Regions:
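ATP/Mg2+ or Mg2+-diphosphate-binding catalytic cores
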Residues: 2, 174-175, 179, 293-331
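A cross-family kinase active-site recognition segment
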Residues: 125-190, 216
Length: 331
C-alpha cells in the first residue's frame, strides 16, 4: 500500500515488535510498496534489519468476512509458508516466528503483524512480462510439498470474496461509505449483468474442472513478477498471504495461457501433471472477480480519499469491464 493505515498507532507497532519478537526498533521507515498489505523497514538497536508487514483484517475479503476469520485465514497461509521453508524450500521467504512461535500476532482488533528477514534483492512489477525461468521449478516444488497442505486453507475452485459481490448486487441503497462509494456504485451498476455472467462462467468452469478430478495442491496464489525477488543467491518468492490448496493452474495462469505454452509444457515435464486449459481460464477469471470483491468491500465501507483508494476505484472500473475478454466463452 502507498499510504500507512490511518487508524494504526505507530507506537502500537513499536510495542508489538518489542513484545512479540524482542525487537527494540531504532528506526522504522514506511515502505510504500505492493498492494493489500502495509510494510515497514525496521532497523533494531543492534543493527539487525527486518521487514514488518501489517494487514488490515477488515480489508481481507478473500480471507474471511470478519476480522477473526481473516486472522485465522492469514495465520493458516503463513503457517503453510513456514512449513514449506522448514521442508527445505530455501526460496520461500517465510515469517520469522514470534517469541511464542507464532507466524503472526494481532495488533489491536483490526490488524495483524508478521515479521520477515530483510532480503536484499530486486523485484519486478506486477505488469512485467512473466519470466518463467526458475519460477516453474519453484512452483513445481511448492505443489509437490504434500506435508504442508495440512496447514493451508482450501480455496479450491471457488471465487474468494464472492459474498461481497452478491451483497453489492443486492444493495440498491446509495453507497455512502466514502468519496469513492457512489462512483463505485455507478460503475458496478452499469456492468451488473456482465458481472453476473462472469460469476456464472466461473461456476461452469469450476464444475467442469471438478468433474475431471483435477488434483489439488498447495499453491502460492500470486507468483507474479512483483512477488519474485532476484538475490545474489537466486530467485526467492515472497508474499505468502494468498497460500491455499487448489488446482495447480492457480499458480500457472500468469505464465501460460494454454497448455501448449512453454511454461505449461515445462511444468508437465517436471511434474508429470498435464495442465488444464479450462483451469487456466478459470483462475485468470477468478483473479479479476477476487479483486472486484476486495474493491467492493473497501469502497462500500467507510474510507477516505488517498492514493490507495483511488487505485482501488480504478481497479474496480477495470474489473467490471472485462466481459469482452471472455466473449468466446460467453457468446
Amino acid at each position: 500500500m502507498r499510504t500507512p493505515p490511518a487508524d494504526l498507532d505507530p507506537g502500537a507497532l513499536v510495542r508489538a515488535l518489542a513484545d512479540g519478537w524482542g525487537i527494540a526498533a531504532d528506526r522504522i521507515d514506511y515502505a510504500p510498496v505492493g498492494a493489500g498489505s502495509h510494510h515497514w523497514r525496521v532497523v533494531a538497536d543492534d543493527g539487525v534489519r527486518t521487514f514488518a508487514t501489517v494487514d488490515h483484517l477488515g480489508q481481507k475479503a478473500w480471507l474471511g468476512d470478519d476480522p477473526d476469520a481473516a486472522f485465522a485465514g492469514l495465520r493458516a497461509a503463513l503457517d503453510t509458508a513456514t512449513a514449506l521453508a522448514g521442508s527445505g524450500l530455501g526460496f520461500v521467504v517465510a515469517p520469522r516466528p514470534s517469541a511464542g512461535g507464532a507466524s503472526l500476532l494481532r495488533v489491536g482488533e483490526l490488524f495483524a503483524l508478521a515479521v520477515y528477514p530483510f532480503v536484499d534483492g530486486r523485484s519486478g512489477d506486477f505488469d512485467d512480462a512473466p519470466d518463467g525461468e526458475g519460477v516453474v521449478e519453484m512452483l513445481a516444488a511448492v505443489h509437490g510439498a504434500e506435508n504442508a497442505a495440512a496447514h493451508a486453507s482450501a480455496e479450491g475452485v471457488s471465487v474468494p470474496g464472492r459474498s461481497h459481490i452478491l451483497a453489492a448486487m443486492q444493495d440498491e441503497r446509495p453507497w455512502s461509505g466514502g468519496p469513492f462509494s457512489r462512483p463505485a456504485q455507478r460503475a458496478f451498476e452499469a456492468h451488473r449483468g456482465d458481472v453476473a455472467d462472469l460469476l456464472a462462467l466461473a461456476d461452469r468452469l469450476a464444475a467442469a474442472i471438478e468433474a475431471r478430478g483435477r488434483p489439488h495442491v498447495v499453491t502460492h496464489g500470486e507468483p507474479h513478477p512483483g512477488n519474485i525477488l532476484t538475490t545474489a543467491g537466486g530467485k526467492v518468492l515472497v508474499d505468502w498471504d494468498t497460500v491455499s490448496v487448489a488446482p495447480p493452474e492457480r499458480d500457472l495462469w500468469g505464465l501460460a495461457r494454454t497448455p501448449g505454452d512453454p511454461a505449461a509444457v515445462a511444468y508437465t515435464e517436471l511434474t508429470g501433471r498435464p495442465v488444464d486449459g479450462d483451469a487456466l481460464d478459470l483462475f485468470r477469471l477468478i483473479w479479476d472477480l477476487k479483486d472486484l470483491a476486495e474493491y467492493l468491500h473497501v469502497l462500500r465501507a467507510p474510507h477516505t480519499e488517498n492514493e490507495d483508494t483511488e487505485r482501488e476505484f480504478r481497479g474496480l472500473e477495470h474489473c467490471v469491464s472485462v466481459r469482452g475478454e471472455w466473449a468466446g466463452r460467453l457468446d
